[in-house]
Amino acid sequence: MFVLDPAAICCCAVTCCCGVGSVCAYRKRQSIPHPSECALIGKMYRLCGCHDHDKFDVLIEIHEIHDLTQSGKFFVEVHAGRSEERTGVCSAKKGRVEIQERVNIHVRQADKTLTVRVKKQGLTSTEAIGDAVIGVKSELIDGAFPKRQSFFCQKDGKTACKIVLSFHRLDTGNVSLGDFQMSPLLHQALLIAQSEAEARGETLQVDILNMTEVERLRFLSKVLEGPLKQMSSIGGAWKNLYFRAAERRNGKWEWQYWSSKDDCMSGIKKRGAYSFMAISLVLPDKHDRHCFYIRYHDTGGVHDLFFKRVDRDRNLWSDGLFEFIEKLREYLEKHPEVAMSGRGGHSSRREKKKEGDVGGSRTPRKRDGKALTPRTGASDDAGDDGIRGRSPRGSDRRALSHRSFVDPAELAEKRRVLSPRETAADEMTRPRASVLKGRMIEGLMYDRSLQPGEKNEEASEADERPRERTEGVEYEREEEQPLLFTQ
């Protein structure tokens, strides 16, 4: 006869709890810390030869997937011990998926392999396409962290596809940061400096702490150089451009662009530029992982600019632009005289032609039989009206040239209005890039070159519309009156 006494009940409860706990622990066994994660125990493991490498962080750049036999939407998962990261979902085109995303993975000293898994996104579930198992010591460390190397993804002993990966490990042994925090912009700038040092056969040696603020800006500006696609305002086609951040004069920074990298390196005149101080919003597209949006101000008003990444992660561009503009504003707010020296002390080519600099004299030439000298009151007033009329804002340029009229509080307020951080925070609803694209084009956006027939049709439509300022005219206006703020 079976009797339910308290001892039997406790024994059954303990048995059930142990069984459930064992099942949960087995399923979550990858999340259980390894003893070597303790610094002292890990050092003993290394001295005994149980582990062949130390712990480190590696940045994995996932470029693309090749040789897919299925269509649909795919994403990539990266596993290393207890660390797991995944990319966004991208669609396949002709057996190829272009991802161009970066994930940061922590590799423990107990981890011997790193697994890259390609999955297909279904309606309610996911399907594993194939895995690529990469040896940490044999393929990563001994292979000097390969760049753009193809790895075979296998499933059931058969090759399912190929994935192209790049591995970046930042050596911070000779990097002095001081109180500066590691940010995405600084991390990418250090990676670029490290690749340049490796190309010269040297080790990375950077002293961020002892750099001046201008030197720090120049060091960070390397991140904003590279190819991009910019959406054309006619038809929504994408045009290939090469961008680079450059300092034209003390405190005057521009995002200049050329038709190609060869034009930039060969010294050909730039096609145009965007002033960093005239960018009020940098917004990644939440619905398109490859695009981002910029709100730009010039003398003609507010412009919506759309860009698409080419050879790197979109977030490198959007986060890099955002952080660089903020650091540039902080520098100019600390040194307001630097910003005004580039603005007030700058004279346009048209004004230089109208000045008579003979023997060091700056007396203007005669116009309509009257000398524009300060001694003649009427002529001086007329000259002031002419200068004020030629200015896009109707302000006196000679008054702007005097630094004694600069109000630091007003200067900071103007910069605050145009700050991307403040603009994004003040907006009740952050604009969706898909809605903003609709302001520029009607219908579907296409990513291809225009055919000759379409170019003729668009040219005829452009002639029927009111004539707009061309890119060259726009840039000449900006050259004459450097735009740092928009009221």
UniProtKB/Swiss-Prot annotation:
The organism's superkingdom is given as Eukaryota
> Per UniProt, which keywords does this protein have?
Cytoplasmic vesicle, Membrane
Entries under Pfam families matching the protein: PH_CERLI1 (PF23634)
Topology in the membrane?
Peripheral membrane protein
Q: Where does it live in the cell?
A: Cytoplasmic vesicle, Secretory vesicle, Rhoptry membrane
* Chain residue ranges for the region called Disordered: 337-487
A cellular component term, taken from the record's GO annotations: cytoplasmic vesicle
Q: What results from gene inactivation? A: No defect in tachyzoite growth, intracellular replication and host cell invasion.
Q: Where is the composition biased (Basic and acidic residues)?
A: 385-399, 454-475
Oligomer and partners: Interacts with RASP2.
What protein am I looking at? Rhoptry apical surface protein 1
Q: Which organism is it from?
A: Toxoplasma gondii (strain ATCC 50853 / GT1)
